[in-house]
Each structure stands twice: as C-alpha cells, then as structure tokens.
C-alpha cells in the first residue's frame, strides 16, 4: 500500500505510540465512493474480483491491523473476531459493507467500504482523553499539492500537524520497492509478507461473511484444477514397520488452511509430489480444519 511509506502515516503511528499506551482504543476508518458503472465493469463483476471490499476495503482493514500492531509493539496485529454487515449488488459483489473488528480487550475497530456511496474516507483513532483525526489517509495530500495534516485533540486542546510532501505518494512507494530490489531484500519493512498474507486472509473472511461467492473460490469451478502443471512424484518414501504402504518422509501439517479451496489446492499438490501422510490433529486452527 502506497500510504505505508508516506510521512503522514509514519507521524500517525508515532502519535499513536505516544498517546494510546495502556488505554482502550477505538479505530474508525473508511474508504468508499459512488461508481455508477455498468454491470460488466470490473467493480461489479464477480469474475474480475469486483466489489468494495477487495477494491478499497483493503485499505481501512490494513490500516486497522497496522495501528493495532503498533500499539502492541508489533508490525501488525490480526483481529480475534469480525462481525460484518453489508449489501450485495445484483451481480453478486458487495456494494457496501462494514466490519467490527476486535483485536484485544482494549483495541477494536469499525471499518467501512463502498462502491455505491461516498464515505468520509478518513481515519480516527480515539480513547477517552485523546482523538487523532487523519483526513485523506489513503491519498496523503496527493490532490492538495502534497499538503497533508493530522489533527490531535488532547485535554481540550486542538493541534494541527501539517506539512508538505515534496516527493509524492506513489513515488515514495516506487522508491521503497526499488531500494528493496537494489539491496536484495525480498520484502519491505513497510509491509512484510506475513502482514500481506494476513490482510488477504481477513479480507476473505470479510467478503465471505458478507455473502460474496467468487467463482474462483468454489472448488468445482476453480481454474487451479485445470492447470497444465504436471508434478513429479519426487518426495522420498520409507517403509514403516507394521504398515504395508510406504509413507512419505515429509508430513503435511493441516494447521493453517483457511478454506476448502485452500486446503484442496495444497493437499493436491503435496499428494501429486509423492506425499501421503497428513497431520490432522483436532486442535489445529481451533478445530476449524474438521468442520
């Protein structure tokens, strides 16, 4: 996300660490717009991953996880629960949705997204005594000639922190990617691979609970199984005393699969490469792997 490398975001995180330690915190964030487009447009097309959540809902979700992580001295923090409300377009994509997220006993968030209504498109972090308001947290002053601001309300006093970015929102993102490539880094400290994966998984939970059913996620319709990839059974197998069938020396742990399609894809690949032993302890993934 381009906003991750911008000084407005970095200043916001600094203020969060300074003012919100050891207190109940509520995060409010939204990204939504009204897009009067045809049904075939990507925003309304299930086959093109349409819908508000995947298009721009990823921004407030990623920001909430970032702030929750910052308040816990981590790069990010995943929610422990999500409650979703929303509506579907006639095409089956979500056109508006909201989610209540709980990160811990003292950190929660309310996020919104839409493709049929203009939302506030802001970020608010607040407790009983402090409130931080970030206007345009995604564009970071991009459309105001680089001028950005953060409003801090503390003990009845309002402070406006303002500055101008002379580099540019997307230029900063490009510079970060270029620097990682030149230094041989496989990931950016601004958003790690684990952070990215976590955001993807919670986006899937969000749109799934909103009732969105992408064709690619339905096992029978998934393009994965029509792949031309031909695996080679190269995993070494050994004999186990008392068992007639040879077993692969590599065992597949069934503790991180998040859906039937996810599990089927990984299990199929493992089996086609010669694997045939699965560790399916009932305690894995809160027993969800058995549901």
Task: Give, region by region, the residue ranges found by the protein language model.
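N-terminal binding-site loop/beta-alpha segment at the start of enzyme catalytic domains
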Residues: 220-288
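Contiguous beta-strand/loop segments that form the cofactor/metal-binding neighborhood of enzyme cores
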Residues: 62-142, 175-184, 204-205, 220
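Short histidine/acidic/glycine/proline-rich micro-motifs that form metal-
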Residues: 2-6, 87-90, 256-258, 282-285
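Alpha-helical elements of Rossmann-like donor-binding domains used by nucleotide-donor carbohydrate transfer enzymes
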Residues: 7, 11-15, 26, 62-63, ...
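C-terminal helix-rich "cap/oligomerization" subdomain common to oxidoreductases
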Residues: 104, 179-236
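C-terminal glycine/acidic-rich active-site capping loop/insertion
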Residues: 126-194, 209, 214-216
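Calmodulin-binding IQ motif helices
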Residues: 291
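Predominantly a Rossmann-like dinucleotide-binding segment in NAD(P)-dependent oxidoreductases
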Residues: 3-78
